[in-house]
Amino acid sequence: MRTLLGVSLCALAVASFAVPFSPSLAQAGISTNPAPLETTGYSSAVEALSKYEVDSSRLALTRSQTQATRAFAQQMIDHHGRVKSDQKAVGGPDAGSALEGPLSEMLNSLENVPSAEFNAAYKRGQIAAHEEALKVHGAYAARGSELAERAKAQAAMPVIQKHLDAAHNLPSA
């Protein structure tokens, strides 16, 4: 399962930063195929994507000069912080470890992108991560191995869609 996640996130990283953003990226199969249906794989994928969204958003707060980008980044940090606190309160997993593999590479690329290109790269990464999160949650909600987790996955989808819609509206410059 870890290998499948690594391979799919590698494809996500390559597509996200090697290709200029276009609406067809989401249709190009850059995400996990198939999405994990066992709880462990699902949880690992969700934790990794969430960590990328937060870490890249912290970077956006220091690198972006655009108010809309900074506001979105703060929203991501705040929302994911609340979710993480809620998970800890009910004994959920802690995603405190460093990013690995493709998501780490995506974050490193974002750290090193020239300032003039930062907003566009951040936008691409957020769109890719949220599209992947929607796919992972949707697949698990439909066919996941644990009913309680399936309900949580389903409940998360409208929030992820809202974040994805907001990411699409971020400025590229």
Spell out what each predicted region is:
Residues 2-12, 16-173:
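His/Met- and acidic-residue-enriched segments that coordinate or traffic transition-metal cofactors
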